[in-house]
């Protein structure tokens, strides 16, 4: 029996991306695969554009902008498929981008989530920030990728052409078995956006599933989406959500030593923003901590539903120190 696959784009005022990139998506997606656009109450005529130009695409409209996490939850509740492919509107796909990933996931029941190779749309021989060749975190919760440490992006010279287990898959192009999505309750809607895929993958690993990288599938990501590259709101979400995913998923004995160190390191980051004359970014870090503390009762309830366990592919070190003090700028130097 053929598995039913649905490629689902969550759109918010991304008509320009849809106009530019839907043609290649339609061209390179097998006809038996459903293409769905969920719309977060866009005001740029995205829905009208789709209706006029792509009548074959299913449109699911949310009544307001619920953000990436809850927006996807509401849309995917209405999609019937065995596999969900969460695809950003600013991603260009290539020929044969679906088949190798599905083949890999079908061959191993334990693989619940998978990502393709993510390259830069503008620098096409370079890994892209949002996912590269698969995501990892260090023991303090700082995320990085094969092919991308902080702002250092590696050229793709085939060095990461091995399929392997990773810690998290990029939300820009994430393949998920629908039964696992439902088992885990989808993304955490309280995240709104940013790092929700890391939390989702960690919960999947805590539930005994695997997250994988498939280099035979290649996509190109513009990046940045609908928030500007430097945004206090983005800073707020990244700092708050990172604390939230640590609180939810770390084993109890790890929480006691990780959190004090992370609080100290966040203060260092906040003071660095002040020294760079970025007071709004400093304030965003402070607000992130305040909002996290406010949410602790809710997070405790969420934590009780997760079976925290020791999971693979967490870097047992401090990526900040390795990168800035020891000058380890590429993934291979970490010795993972």
Task: Report each predicted region and the residues it spans.
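Short aromatic/hydrophobic "clamp" motif used to bind/position activated sugar donors
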Residues: 84
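A conserved acidic beta->alpha catalytic loop
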Residues: 24, 39-48, 64
